[in-house]
């Protein structure tokens, strides 16, 4: 049985998140949680929360055994960018893009 968890509009760029999700793709959830715990990146914390949510969803909604779960799919899509300006010298401005992402984790007991 496949179970999905999503975090939409995560405050991190897709490029930074993809560095982390590539470490855990296809692994067992216990091993993936261990890897994320010791990965020293902000994105690792975001991905860990979504993975824990997917595990809880599988356990509560589908009655799955946590020890049998593996990461079936994990991907990051680009979300909308929030546009900000930063004033500079001589009346100019720099444009700042605050990037967001959508994290999707699918766990399966097969």
UniProtKB/Swiss-Prot annotation:
Originating gene: rplV
UniProt similarity note: Belongs to the universal ribosomal protein uL22 family.
Subunit structure: Part of the 50S ribosomal subunit.
A molecular function GO annotation: structural constituent of ribosome
Organism annotation: Baumannia cicadellinicola subsp. Homalodisca coagulata
One Pfam family recorded for the sequence: Ribosomal_L22
GO biological processes: translation
Protein name (database record): Large ribosomal subunit protein uL22
Alphabetic keyword roster: Ribonucleoprotein, Ribosomal protein, RNA-binding, rRNA-binding
Reported function: This protein binds specifically to 23S rRNA; its binding is stimulated by other ribosomal proteins, e.g. L4, L17, and L20. It is important during the early stages of 50S assembly. It makes multiple contacts with different domains of the 23S rRNA in the assembled 50S subunit and ribosome.
GO annotation, cellular component aspect: cytosolic large ribosomal subunit
């Amino acid at each position: 049985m496949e179970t999905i968890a999503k975090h939409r509009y995560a405050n991190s760029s897709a490029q930074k998140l993809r560095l982390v999700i590539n470490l855990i793709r296809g692994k067992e959830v216990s091993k993936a949680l261990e890897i994320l715990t010791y990965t020293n990146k902000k994105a690792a914390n975001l991905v860990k929360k979504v993975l824990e949510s997917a595990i809880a969803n599988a356990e509560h909604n589908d009655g799955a055994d946590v020890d049998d779960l593996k990461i079936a799919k994990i991907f990051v899509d680009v979300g909308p960018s929030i546009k900000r300006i930063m004033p500079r010298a001589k009346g100019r401005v720099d444009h700042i893009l605050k990037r967001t992402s959508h994290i999707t984790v699918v766990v399966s007991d097969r």
